[in-house]
C-alpha cells in the first residue's frame, strides 16, 4: 500500500510560500528511476536537490528489503546530471543522519522537521553563504553536534502542496495521510518518533485542522483520512473535540 509522502508535501508548500520554484519527482510513479530523474533535472535545472527518505527498509521481517542502495543510486544519478547540492531528509534519514549521509555521499542532511530548515538553506544558498551553522543541518565537513533535531512551530505550516503529486494513486483506494499534532512525551523504548518530532507536543487548532480536511475533500475529492500523529487519542479531549468539529461540517 503506497503511503503518501506527507512530510515532503509540507516541505514543498513551505518552499513555494517563500517564492521558490518547486518540482517533485515521485519515484513511486516509475520503475525507471534514472530516466525519470534525468528528464526532471534537465527540464527543471534545479539549484538545490532534496531527497526525502521515509523508510530505510520495507519493515517485513520475513522478506526484508533494505532501501539504502536504491537511495545511494538516486543520489549518484542526481550527481550525474546536476552539480546542485543534494540534501537528504525525512523520518528515515533523521534516525541516523550522519551514518546515512556518509553512506550515500550526500552534501547535506536535515535531521528532524525540514519545512523551515530547507527554506533557510535555500535562501542562504542563493547568497552563496555557508549553511552548516543552521540548526538541524548535517554536514560531514562540520563538527558533529549532539542536539540535531530542532523543533519548529508546526502550527504555522502551510497547507501541503498536494497539486505536485498524483493524488489519485494514493487516495483512490487508501486513506490519505493527515497530521494534526507533532511530538510525543511518552518514553516507549521501541519508538523513534520523539527523535524525529521531539518530546514537546505541538497541537494544531481544531479549526485549522478541520479547514485543511475540507480543502483536501473539496479540491481533491478525498473522503478517507489516516491520522499519522504518534498518538491520535492523546489528549483525549482534543480527539473528541476534533471528531465533533469534523462531524459539524458535514
Residues covered by each model-derived region:
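Active-site/binding-pocket entry motifs
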Residues: 55, 150-151, 162-164
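Radical SAM [4Fe-4S] cluster-binding motif and immediate context
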Residues: 155-250
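A short, sequence-level motif marking secondary-structure junctions
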Residues: 146-154
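Glycine-rich beta-alpha loop elements in corrinoid/cobalamin-binding modules
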Residues: 4-7, 11-14, 18, 23-147
Amino acid at each position: 500500500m503506497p503511503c503518501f509522502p506527507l512530510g515532503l508535501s509540507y516541505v514543498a508548500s513551505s518552499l513555494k510560500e517563500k517564492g521558490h520554484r518547486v518540482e517533485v519527482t515521485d519515484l513511486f510513479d516509475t520503475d525507471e528511476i534514472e530516466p525519470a530523474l534525468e528528464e526532471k533535472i534537465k527540464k527543471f535545472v534545479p539549484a538545490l536537490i532534496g531527497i526525502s527518505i521515509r523508510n530505510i527498509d520495507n519493515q517485513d521481517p520475513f522478506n526484508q528489503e533494505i532501501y539504502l542502495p536504491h537511495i545511494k543510486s538516486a543520489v549518484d544519478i542526481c550527481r550525474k546530471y546536476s552539480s546542485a547540492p543534494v540534501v537528504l531528509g525525512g523520518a528515515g534519514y533523521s534516525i541516523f543522519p550522519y551514518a546515512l549521509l556518509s553512506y550515500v555521499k550526500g552534501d547535506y542532511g536535515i535531521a528532524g522537521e525540514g519545512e523551515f530548515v530547507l527554506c533557510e538553506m535555500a535562501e542562504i544558498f542563493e547568497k552563496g553563504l555557508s549553511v552548516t551553522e543552521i540548526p538541524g543541518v548535517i554536514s560531514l565537513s562540520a563538527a558533529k553536534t549532539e542536539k540535531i533535531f530542532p523543533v519548529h512551530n508546526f502550527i504555522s505550516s502551510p497547507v501541503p502542496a498536494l497539486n505536485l503529486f498524483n493524488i489519485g494513486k494514493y487516495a483512490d483506494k487508501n486513506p490519505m495521510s493527515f497530521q494534526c499534532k507533532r511530538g510525543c512525551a511518552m518514553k516507549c523504548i521501541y519508538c523513534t518518533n520523539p527523535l524525529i518530532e521531539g518530546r514537546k507536543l505541538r497541537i494544531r487548532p481544531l479549526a485549522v485542522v478541520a479547514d485543511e480536511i475540507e480543502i483536501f475533500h473539496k479540491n481533491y475529492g478525498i473522503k478517507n483520512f489516516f491520522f499519522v500523529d504518534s498518538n491520535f487519542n492523546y489528549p483525549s479531549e482534543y480527539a473528541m473535540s476534533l471528531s465533533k468539529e469534523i462531524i459539524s461540517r458535514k
